[in-house]
Amino acid sequence: MPAKKRTRKTVKKTVSFSDDTTLTTHQNREKKNVDHDRPPVYVRKTPLMTFPYHLVALLYYYVFVSSNFNTVKLLSFLIPTQVAYLVLQFNKCTVYGNKIIKINYSLTIICLGVTFLLSFPTMLLTILFGAPLMDLLWETWLLSLHFAFLAYPAVYSVFNCDFKVGLWKKYFIFIVVGGWISCVVIPLDWDRDWQNWPIPIVVGGYLGALVGYTIGAYI
């Protein structure tokens, strides 16, 4: 009988370099340190808590109560109510790492000044999008102030969360998109007072902010 051939098992050879192992371990430690130093930031999915009830009241006042759509007076109501919304609602839903950040009252005041300054680049962008420059410059700046202070809670959160801009930019986008969509009613030949610049854009910005702060946590 022919002798059976023995099959030899192939042994996989592995080579380990201590320098590579040390480098991998060091990179893993660095990643853990980065995660510890820059914990994740998110807004809790609590629409009843993040819903900006005050914007509904302000819109109702502006459209149905105020005389001649007083944009200046509306702004004087917007600023304090946005601060109250940040302190009482929005900040309590913002989680940094594993904890809710306590409100920084000095930072709220600083961010009021920052938001005011943001109205100037906002005005420039509004003009680039086609806003009137010479004839209605005051109205255009008022619109920019409204847009800037509608984003005030997001501006504060950028400063209070180590400048994590990516999370908060969606709130700016909602405001801009709301104002941009509302432009369609201006050229219509209806001859209504509410078609005058910048009334429709103000209303659109408020509606955009209303939607953004309500569903922003889900996006």
UniProtKB/Swiss-Prot annotation:
The keyword Membrane applies. One of its GO terms (biological process) is GPI anchor biosynthetic process. GO terms for molecular function: mannose-ethanolamine phosphotransferase activity. It is found in: Endoplasmic reticulum membrane. The gene is GPI11. Keywords: Endoplasmic reticulum, GPI-anchor biosynthesis, Membrane, Phosphoprotein, Transmembrane, Transmembrane helix. This is Glycosylphosphatidylinositol anchor biosynthesis protein 11. Residues 1-45, 89-108, 157-170, 218-219 are cytoplasmic. It comes from Saccharomyces cerevisiae (strain ATCC 204508 / S288c). It is a multi-pass membrane protein. Pathway: Glycolipid biosynthesis; glycosylphosphatidylinositol-anchor biosynthesis. Residues 67, 130-135, 192-198 are lumenal. Belongs to the PIGF family. One of its GO terms (cellular component) is endoplasmic reticulum membrane. It comes from the Eukaryota. The chain crosses the membrane at residues 46-66, 68-88, 109-129, 136-156, 171-191, 199-217. Acts in the GPI biosynthetic pathway between GlcNAc-PI synthesis and GPI transfer to protein. Required for the formation of complete GPI precursors CP1 and CP2. The modification Phosphoserine is found at residue 16.
